[in-house]
């Protein structure tokens, strides 16, 4: 080409022959699986933009590239640039790893089989065999508008994050099979051609900030995995760099409006782009923009108690992980320490301790799958997932004995077992130890002004989960679906799991019956801690929330450790409201339906597990209580599927200016038979700041009280 100052490549894409199949070492295939076809030929790689317009030819190491370009030998300059990148060793990406498990290897191969692109584990055509949906049209082209029947918006959003591409890069590193490179080139070229950058603000799906951020992070990995391939040509390098810069420029131009995980992912991606591709002209600006966002948002994204403002442990862990990656990026590439605020270290340490205190003692049992609560838009974390994070936390803070205890599955001195209050996010933890046989209760009383359907926090009004001796007796209902505004069925599912009565808490209704989805929801989530006390034998927290304009829920939780272990809940509803108060309880999960018995006459329930790990629940009130069974639900995937479990509500009439008051006893036992439980109020009902109760369990009486 004879243009000295500009090098142009014209985009010209033709159809590629597709191929399919897995190797003998991949996920087993049934006999009716589609047989492999011929491998594709690589696309013609042309583009209409100038590579040399986006390069900083004065960057150290590009001297020969610059000389060849100045001499008008653009082909040679491009070839020299490719050699430079292939031999570059001083720029280090902390996320690189050739480790690939069997499932990930399968996803790398399925991307070649009828364009079966891995989106996430919730969107699989065959969940048992881990087979993603196919995006192949009848004419063998890719349908980027595809979404499975009934899927919410997340499928299309996450499809455009290209999560399968780095997996193909890892597969290439392990096999050096060129089919992975050819697939990557073909599919990415097709995506770029069919999904051009918007002329203005980000759209909702393809060029939404989180999608762009994730693509940038993935491409920084794919580039390194594939760059040694003979099919990684100088023309492809040009195509890749032009569109990588296009992504980073666009992301730096449109800062996400919310102060949450999406904005943080945007910032991290920009710092990665600017650091890992410093040869590009705008790299310093990308890096600075990303660091500025992080420094500005650190105290906004993280609340003073260490929890992130989404109030979701799932997103919290992801945010901490992104900042861990960022710190490693800065350390490995010897960037100046002052790029990030000195506050970040202290904020991150607090954030790691949130994860630690939210971890159930089952974490210390090999193979455990249920090791965390799942409040709000969150999912239960397994032992292995949590440990990977604790290893990173201990790396960031090597002198912290608590994080090292978690990293090593219990070697050393455990954290203390005192009450942990996270007052700014509304979470509270009571426990008696850190062994698998321990007891731990997590109380959630959300503090958030975001109550709309799209919010990650739910309308809980003071719910809880209770872990005892390896079993979660009150797991949260979970999340069944994300958003899809124009799909009534999807939105009904999302609203069912978000509604207040889907939690272990109190609602205000207008009838004695279970009312329509969302009709009894609180309209304000400003949970407040009003008291916290403890001694060697007992822990107490008292919280409240003015969830309705004329009805306030106050919940006291007494945890009696000695001489007999039990919990006493005092739930009170104050205000001028009239109607019916309903105290909901949702027990165990779908696998335990036959082990949960509702005791209607005793206003409670009990479990009948054969492992001698059971619970009796009994409630008492300041007036008559009616127990109504309720079809509870539980779901920890956003695949619009759920299981039914046992639940119930305890109903009292709410009269004007008269409080409703419940006492609920949770008593861990080996078997539920032959136990007698009673509880009564012994205080002056005219003084709402004074609570005194007597609890009698098997002829032993315990006096519990607090004064505000």
Residue ranges of model-derived segments:
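Bacterial N-terminal signal peptides that target proteins for export
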Residues: 2-11
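Cytochrome P450 core scaffold surrounding the K-helix E-X-X-R motif
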Residues: 474-477, 483-486
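Aromatic-lined, polymer-binding surfaces characteristic
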Residues: 141, 146-351
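Carbohydrate-active enzyme catalytic cores, enriched for enzymes
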Residues: 303, 307-473, 655-657, 661, ...
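Bacterial signal peptide processing site
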Residues: 23-25
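CBM-like, beta-strand-rich accessory domains located in the C-terminal region of large
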Residues: 213, 485-708
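C-terminal motif of bacterial Sec signal peptides marking the signal peptidase cleavage site
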Residues: 19-21
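Extreme N-terminal leader/anchor segments
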Residues: 40-127
